[in-house]
């Protein structure tokens, strides 16, 4: 299955026999060509009540690639950072709790991107990059052009007691360590793509 997020909404690409299709609130959509992709994106963009749309297909990867081809694709890297106490690093950006991430520079290894962006957005160093958690996809429109951002999320361990310094020029107003037991209310005020990262990390 592939998930493509539009802020708090989601397009899912799944097999025709996927259990998720039994959800009575799931809207099904059949793709016939690139025009259908644009119609679907327009529909998701303008509808406040449309939360999840599923595209059942026997060719999940081919359908995913066809959708990606209709966007300007960009890559990003980010981190789910924990410290030795087991707390997790969250940032507040534009009124939502988020994880530090940012765009890949030309020629840059994506793991290096993730490490650099965490350091820039939170002011911390002494990070140990462990394993790739998952890759999430989300769409946004900039200057009238639809972008599809693929974000590589890495598990990171912070080993130094340096204070957090939010990168205010990136609209980050706060960075905080949150105990695992205190995460639920924070995750209620974040994006589904960030919730997916925590889910894939089994947190």
Regions found by a protein language model. Give the residues of each.
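Nudix hydrolase/Nudix homology domain
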Residues: 4, 13-29, 96, 167-203
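Short, hydrophobic/proline-enriched secondary-structure or compact coil segments at domain edges
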Residues: 1-9
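Acidic, metal-coordinating catalytic segment for phosphate/diphosphate chemistry
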Residues: 34-78
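Short hydrophobic/aromatic beta-strand or adjacent loop that forms the aromatic wall/cage
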Residues: 1, 76, 149-153
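Acidic surface patches and DE-rich sequence motifs
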Residues: 6, 83, 92, 141-142
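Unchanged
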Residues: 104-192
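Conserved Nudix-box catalytic region and its N-terminal flanking loop in Nudix hydrolases
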Residues: 20-21, 26-30, 82-119, 124
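Conserved beta-strand and immediately adjacent loop positions that scaffold enzyme active sites
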Residues: 78, 87, 174
């Amino acid at each position: 299955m592939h998930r493509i997020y539009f802020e708090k909404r989601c397009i899912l690409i799944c097999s025709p026999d996927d259990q998720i299709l039994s959800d009575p609130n799931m809207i099904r959509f059949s793709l016939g060509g690139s025009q259908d992709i644009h119609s679907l994106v327009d529909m998701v963009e303008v509808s406040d009540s449309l939360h999840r749309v599923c595209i059942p297909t026997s060719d999940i990867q081919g359908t995913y690639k066809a959708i990606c081809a209709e966007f300007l694709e960009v890559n990003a890297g980010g981190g789910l950072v924990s410290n030795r106490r087991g707390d997790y690093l969250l940032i507040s950006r534009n009124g939502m709790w988020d994880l530090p991430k940012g765009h890949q520079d030309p020629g840059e290894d994506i793991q290096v991107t993730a490490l650099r962006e965490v350091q820039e957005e939170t002011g911390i160093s002494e990070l140990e990059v462990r394993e790739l958690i998952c890759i999430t996809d989300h769409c946004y429109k900039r200057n009238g052009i639809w972008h599809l951002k693929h974000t590589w999320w890495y598990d990171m361990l912070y080993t130094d007691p340096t204070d957090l310094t939010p990168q205010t020029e990136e609209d980050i107003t706060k960075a905080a360590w949150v105990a695992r037991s205190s995460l639920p209310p924070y995750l209620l005020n974040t994006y589904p793509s960030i919730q997916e990262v925590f889910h894939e990390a089994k947190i």
